[in-house]
Design a protein with these regions (language model features):
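A short, compositionally biased domain-edge/stem linker segment
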Residues: 1-8
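N-terminal glycine-rich phosphate/pyrophosphate-binding loop and immediately adjacent elements
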Residues: 9-157
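Short, contiguous strand/loop micro-motifs
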Residues: 16-17, 180-181, 244
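Ligand-binding pocket scaffold of soluble enzyme catalytic domains
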Residues: 44, 97, 215, 228, ...
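A short glycine/serine-rich beta->alpha loop
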Residues: 59-62, 217-220, 242-244
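N-terminal low-complexity, intrinsically disordered patches enriched in charged
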Residues: 70, 220-223, 227, 235-237
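Rossmann-like flavin
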Residues: 103-226
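Helical element adjacent to the flavin cofactor pocket in flavoenzyme catalytic cores
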Residues: 188, 233-244
Length: 244
């Protein structure tokens, strides 16, 4: 017998899985379940799907993202597995990537062009402008270690089997390849963003701009342990083969 609540909603039949909410996470889960042969029903109360990743016309003639500020953290493996590009999915790079207006009329604009970014940072600190490429290279090196683990099933540490031991061995080897960056990687994953930015840079304007990635959506200050990872996590986004 059909569920009376489902019947009132005009939905009939039997399903293996019901996903409540057609946000991007729910849609991805539903697609993978359907690929695995499950009969899936997705329920959404709004007239459009996408959850926080939607574009809406909130002023006549102007369409904006009404929630998500970036979409580059959407995993490339998902785009590939679900063949989203064949259906028109495309992530556009932000240009500029950030704009920081200051009370004295100055501003700091960062973007994908390395020389432009260097000149912008140099307005506040020549030292920071010189160090910024090294900072980005450090983040890239740590990201190369962390990123493959995002789609990995964590090893069972309580009752490890042969596969768990192989995963642990692989993680240990990958971590060892970080070399002298290993302590910095640990701090990025567990420490406060402020300590990291203070060590790399002297300009308050640049540090404030970069710190926004560490606190957005986190309800925490840059001095809170763990915000280093929030800062780092945003670096693992990717658009057209470019991180950020």
């Amino acid at each position: 017998m059909d569920n009376p609540i489902m019947a009132r909603a005009g939905v009939r039949g039997r399903y293996d899985v019901i996903v409540v909410g057609a946000g991007h996470n729910g849609l991805v889960a539903a697609c993978y379940l359907a690929r695995a042969g499950r009969r899936v029903l997705v329920l959404e109360r709004r007239p459009l799907v996408g959850g926080a990743c939607v574009t809406e016309e909130i002023f006549p003639g102007y369409k904006v993202s009404t929630a998500a500020y970036v979409a580059s953290l959407f995993r490339k493996e998902i785009v590939r597995d679900l063949r989203l590009g064949e259906y028109g999915f495309e992530v556009l790079a932000r240009n500029p990537s950030s704009f920081t207006p200051l009370p004295d009329g100055r501003s700091l604009t960062l973007g994908p062009d390395a020389e432009w970014t260097r000149r912008e940072i140099a307005k506040f600190s020549a030292r920071d402008a010189a160090r910024y490429p090294e900072y980005e290279a450090m983040l890239e090196r740590v990201a190369a270690f962390v990123e493959p683990t995002l789609a990995m099933t964590p090893p069972d540490l309580l009752r490890p089997g042969p596969r768990d031991l192989l995963r642990l061995l692989g993680l240990g080897r990958a971590f060892g390849r970080l070399g002298d960056r290993a302590p910095e990687a640990v701090e990025l994953l567990a420490g406060p963003a402020r300590a990291i930015l203070d060590r790399w840079f002297e300009s308050g304007e640049l540090k404030a701009t970069l710190a926004t990635d560490a606190i957005i959506g986190a309800m925490a200050s840059p001095s809170t342990p763990g915000t280093g990872y929030v800062l780092f996590h945003h670096v693992m986004g990717e658009t057209g083969g470019r991180r950020g």
